[in-house]
């Protein structure tokens, strides 16, 4: 169970449940790529070690306002308002680097599932993703006693807006 403790009351003052056709809007037709073929899932420690390699391309799959308050060291942060924009920007920007080792990360791992499948569909050869996203990374790094490579705060979708990663 994952939880956050906030001492000033409830994080959400209103709960709205909506049924959507996709968990994350990507603007892509379901038939254009295979969501069962995703990048390799990396543990927090594997991701942590690989982010220190200058040959590795670390890409933030979150929106620009999320990466502005926090990101991993040396990460490329697309200037995208939406995931729909970010996924296309990454393919276009790095189209000539399809053989390079790519590490993707996002808040909880959902956007990276789609992004890694899309990159593999477009011919990228070595795509990995941080399993469980920044949230899982923060918990594992703290448990292992390692110094985090995440700079700033992790954007959260409640009134706190950001959560420190130690």
PLM regions with names:
Residues 1-40, 53, 63-102, 110-166:
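Rhodanese-like catalytic fold shared by cysteine-dependent sulfurtransferases
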Residues 105:
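Short, surface-exposed ligand- or partner-binding patches at beta-edge/loop junctions that are enriched
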């Amino acid at each position: 169970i994952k939880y956050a403790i906030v001492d000033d009351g409830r994080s959400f003052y209103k709960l709205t449940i909506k049924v959507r056709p996709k968990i994350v809007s990507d603007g892509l037709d379901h038939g254009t790529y295979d969501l069962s073929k995703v990048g390799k899932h990396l543990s927090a420690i594997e991701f942590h070690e690989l982010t220190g390699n200058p040959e590795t391309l670390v890409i933030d799959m979150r929106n620009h306002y999320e990466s502005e308050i926090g990101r991993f060291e040396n990460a490329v942060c697309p200037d995208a308002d939406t995931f729909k924009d970010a996924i296309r920007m990454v393919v276009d920007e790095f189209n000539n680097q399809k053989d390079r080792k790519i590490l993707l990360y996002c808040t909880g791992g959902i956007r990276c599932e789609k992004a890694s499948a899309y990159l593999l569909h477009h011919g990228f050869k070595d795509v990995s993703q941080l399993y469980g996203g920044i949230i899982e990374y923060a918990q594992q790094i703290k448990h292992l006693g390692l110094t985090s490579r995440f700079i700033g705060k992790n954007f959260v979708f409640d009134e706190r807006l950001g959560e420190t990663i130690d």
